[in-house]
């Protein structure tokens, strides 16, 4: 019995083993691996085409040094996309609704882009804290604001992904519960509510794909500033 709407976001366990580990391993089992054959199947061809188009669009503004990140970000994109889509299926735990997981992905990758900027172009990286032509009276305030803006980036990355997916799951839960309650009393209203639930589910599919893309896009923009 569900005691709270947020019980669906608690990490279940089986025989003392957290099921979040199985949920994190599931995308790597579902995504087909390329083969050495001349002619691959349709799924592998579609996957290769999608990754190639995504990588070209994402790394076109970056210089050659930033292209080293292409395998990592493309793999992370497929990983997040698969987790988000699987989370919309019934009785499947969604790891990306956990802020700890999202921050665990956002903070190290953001920190890596900052350290790369400090190593490759320290003058340019430190110049973001104090733009040229700043009045002397505003220098301390501006440095504090730029520092806060820099350190809030990974928090915004993790919270954005968590909040969007959590809100969508809660809405689906509420509307589906309303359909079951209204079905015996007002069937017509229940059918209309079910249609609304179907439209909301389609919207959540789009949100799941968009949020995975936005997460990687923002990381690439942070990388573009420092590479």
Curated annotation (Swiss-Prot):
Record PROSITE patterns: ATPASE_A
Chief place of localization: mitochondrion
Gene3D superfamilies, A to Z: ATP synthase, F0 complex, subunit A (1.20.120.220)
Single GO MF descriptor: proton-transporting ATP synthase activity, rotational mechanism
GO cellular component: mitochondrial inner membrane; proton-transporting ATP synthase complex
Compartment(s): Mitochondrion inner membrane
Membrane topology: Multi-pass membrane protein
Residue stretches spanning the membrane: 14-34, 73-93, 98-118, 137-157, 179-199, 203-223
Gene Ontology annotations of biological process type: proton motive force-driven ATP synthesis; proton transmembrane transport
Catalyzed reactions per annotation: H(+)(in) = H(+)(out)
Pfam families to which the protein is assigned, alphabetical: ATP-synt_A (PF00119)
Record keywords, A-Z: ATP synthesis, CF(0), Hydrogen ion transport, Ion transport, Membrane, Mitochondrion, Mitochondrion inner membrane, Transmembrane, Transmembrane helix, Transport
Coiled coil: none
Subunit-structure text: Component of the ATP synthase complex composed at least of ATP5F1A/subunit alpha, ATP5F1B/subunit beta, ATP5MC1/subunit c (homooctomer), MT-ATP6/subunit a, MT-ATP8/subunit 8, ATP5ME/subunit e, ATP5MF/subunit f, ATP5MG/subunit g, ATP5MK/subunit k, ATP5MJ/subunit j, ATP5F1C/subunit gamma, ATP5F1D/subunit delta, ATP5F1E/subunit epsilon, ATP5PF/subunit F6, ATP5PB/subunit b, ATP5PD/subunit d, ATP5PO/subunit OSCP.
Record's function text: Subunit a, of the mitochondrial membrane ATP synthase complex (F(1)F(0) ATP synthase or Complex V) that produces ATP from ADP in the presence of a proton gradient across the membrane which is generated by electron transport complexes of the respiratory chain. ATP synthase complex consist of a soluble F(1) head domain - the catalytic core - and a membrane F(1) domain - the membrane proton channel. These two domains are linked by a central stalk rotating inside the F(1) region and a stationary peripheral stalk.
NCBIfam families the UniProt entry points to: ATP_synt_6_or_A
Similarity comment: Belongs to the ATPase A chain family.
Protein known as: ATP synthase F(0) complex subunit a
Source species of the chain: Gadus morhua
């Amino acid at each position: 019995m569900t005691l709270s709407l947020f019980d669906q976001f608690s990490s279940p366990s089986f025989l003392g083993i957290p099921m979040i580990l199985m949920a994190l391993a599931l995308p790597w089992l579902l995504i087909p691996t390329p083969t050495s054959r001349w002619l691959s199947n349709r799924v592998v061809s579609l996957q290769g085409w999608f990754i190639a188009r995504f990588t070209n669009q994402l790394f076109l503004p970056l210089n050659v040094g930033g292209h080293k990140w292409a395998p990592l970000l493309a793999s992370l994109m497929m990983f997040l996309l698969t987790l988000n889509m699987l989370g919309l299926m019934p009785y499947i735990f969604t790891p990306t609704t956990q802020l700890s997981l999202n921050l665990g992905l956002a903070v190290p990758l953001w920190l890596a882009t900052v350290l790369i900027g400090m190593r490759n172009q320290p003058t340019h990286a430190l110049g973001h804290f104090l733009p040229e032509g700043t009045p002397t009276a505003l220098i301390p305030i501006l440095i504090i604001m730029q520092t806060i803006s820099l350190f809030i980036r990974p928090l915004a990355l993790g919270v954005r992904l968590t909040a969007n997916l959590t809100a969508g799951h809660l809405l689906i839960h509420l509307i589906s519960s309303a359909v079951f309650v209204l079905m015996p009393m007002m069937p017509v209203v229940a059918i209309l509510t079910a249609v609304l639930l179907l439209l909301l589910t389609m919207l959540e599919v789009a949100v799941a794909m968009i949020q995975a893309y936005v997460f990687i896009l923002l990381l690439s923009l942070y990388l573009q500033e420092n590479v």
